[in-house]
Design a protein with these regions (language model features):
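N-terminal membrane topogenesis motif
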Residues: 1-26, 78-82, 86, 205-221, ...
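Membrane-interface junctions at transmembrane-helix termini in multi-pass inner-membrane proteins
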Residues: 128-151, 199, 334-365
């Protein structure tokens, strides 16, 4: 298998596993929303936000391990790679226990209005189990065992969906949290018995400091991205309460699923981008990755965004009518995900060209813009749609700054920049026109489930018919002289640095 097909295969593993896992989580989210109600579902989303931030208690050691252990494996320093993984496991576990202890201390403060304290005790337990699971995934990726990593992700999603929904049905949110902890333990056991993947703890202060120094800037960037995707929900939780959060956050299960494909592609593509740019020593390679990659990815995602926009109202209308207010903001954010998708390749190229600080600044600017926009929307009583527009402004800000910086670093001349941005803008305009036209041409049928399903299918078919020629053309172009060809090894007879 040549390098290009190897990269595509690895991307396929990562993307397929993420979509299968997120599809199961969508089922889980719908089940939880139904059995817990808006207030209970809002409480779980508040806890989930806390869990996301607690996932970075290791201060970047996982990211540092992913970089250094991968290099050690590539140079056949297996013992050193294992020691690095063991050190990262120790830092990860100590950080998780420290955060869990902090949560336990906070909930023990008398008079603190946090509701059922035992739920937060369970959350503290989830911090430890979740963080060790995240370490396990990073450890597998450092060994390039993408297939096994993907299989375990699907297993965890399957267990947490089945047992989690049953737990919520029987015992409410407490049952769901207990089931989630059990699922992590079952996943660990499976990993240990079938793959030999169980963390071997190593105490090495020097290596721990090295891993943290390497991974901390990466962690800050990831933390800013998490904050950007959650700043709207955090402000809704603080300013409007958990009931409003439960209604607003339901749509995030769809938007999160959409973002998994470019995230999976970026995760696999980044090391190959670095290698390709480093080998070629040519600025033309950077330009090719940036422009051709963004064009291909945005073309591929447009039909997915269109289908998600048109399908979103269907399950909410018939399965979760209490959450009907989440439809419009959800559709706004589905369209808004076009911006970070288009900027995915730009981010990888920017980091490969030494622009990590610029990317951090872009993320920080996106968080600030989103925070201001959402805060003003809530204070002015603008409703959920205005809140979603504020969040969308943050996504556009980050994507715009990172893309502009990547174009500068890659040395794109002004005509090329204008043409590149114009293509992306026209593609987004076409996406908006297509979904609006399909919704107008084929109206919904809220009185009949069967007819509503048929009409939704027809709307999606019309949208796909519009995007099909462009997708086919992009794929043929990629097969003929694909942008991933730049990642081929030097000396390959088909390599071109023109």
């Amino acid at each position: 298998m040549d390098r290009r097909h190897q990269i595509l295969a690895q991307m396929s593993y990562a993307a397929a596993a993420r979509y299968i896992s997120q599809g199961l989580r969508i089922v889980r989210g719908i089940g939880l929303a139904h059995f817990l109600g808006p207030a209970g579902f809002g409480l779980w989303n508040a806890m989930r936000i806390v869990l996301q931030f607690c996932g970075y208690a290791e201060l970047g050691a996982r990211s540092g391990m992913l970089q250094h252990a991968t290099y050690a494996e590539a140079t056949r320093q297996t013992d050193h790679a294992n020691r690095l993984r063991g050190t990262a496991a120790t830092v990860n576990l100590v950080g998780a226990i420290a955060v869990a202890a902090g949560i336990a201390f906070v909930i023990s403060i008398p008079g603190l209005a946090i509701g059922d304290r035992w739920l937060w005790v369970a959350l503290a337990g989830l911090v430890v189990t979740q963080n060790m699971w995240m370490y396990l995934q990073s450890s597998l990726r450092s060994q390039r065992r993408y297939g096994l990593c993907s299989s375990l992700s699907i297993l965890m999603a399957t267990l947490s969906t089945g047992l989690g929904v049953l737990g919520a049905y029987w015992y409410g949110i407490a049952g769901f949290l207990a089931a989630l902890i059990l699922c992590y333990l079952l996943a660990y056991t499976t990993s240990f018995w079938f793959a030999g993947q169980f963390p071997r703890l190593v105490v090495d202060r020097d290596q721990a400091s090295r891993l943290i120094r390497t991974g901390f800037p990466i962690m800050v960037g990831d933390l800013l991205k998490v904050l950007m995707w959650n700043v709207d929900k955090i402000l809704v939780w603080i300013l409007m309460g958990k009931h409003a959060l439960g209604i607003y956050a339901l749509q995030s299960t769809i938007t999160n699923a959409i973002m998994l494909l470019p995230a999976g592609i970026s995760e696999v593509l980044y090391p190959h981008v670095v290698a390709g740019i480093g080998r070629s020593k040519s600025i033309d390679t950077s330009r090719r990755y940036l422009t051709d990659g963004a064009d291909l990815l945005s073309r591929a995602m447009c039909p997915i965004l269109a289908v998600a926009f048109l399908v979103l109202p269907l399950p909410i209308r018939w399965l979760l009518p209490a959450y009907h207010e989440t439809v419009a903001p959800g559709q706004v954010l589905v369209l808004a995900t076009f911006f970070p998708i288009a900027g995915t390749v730009a981010g990888s190229v920017l980091v490969a060209l030494g622009g990590q600080r610029v990317l951090l600044a872009a993320s920080a600017a996106g968080v600030i813009v989103a925070g201001i926009g959402v805060g003003l929307a809530i204070q002015s009583g603008g409703g959920y749609v205005a809140i979603a527009l504020g969040a969308a402004a943050g996504l556009l800000t980050r994507a715009g700054i990172s893309t502009a910086a990547a174009m500068t670093r890659a040395g794109l001349e002004t005509p090329a920049r204008i043409g590149f941005l114009a293509r992306l803008a026209l593609r987004f305009a076409l996406l908006v026109l297509v979904v609006a036209g399909a919704a107008w041409a084929v109206p919904a049928a809220p009185d009949s489930l069967l007819l509503d399903c048929l009409l939704t299918t027809l709307r999606c078919t019309l949208a796909l018919a519009v995007f099909a020629p462009g997708m086919l053309k992009a794929w043929r172009t990629q097969r003929r002289n694909g942008w991933l060809a730049a990642a081929r090894p030097v000396g390959d007879e088909t390599t071109s640095h023109a």
